[in-house]
Amino acid sequence: AVTSSVADTTTVVRDDF
């Protein structure tokens, strides 16, 4: 979830903007 605004389940830190 570096550039993705959707909560991706690939990374531990979920950034749901």
From Swiss-Prot:
It comes from Rubus idaeus. Keywords: Storage protein. This is Rubusin. GO terms for molecular function: nutrient reservoir activity. It comes from the Eukaryota. Acts as a storage protein.
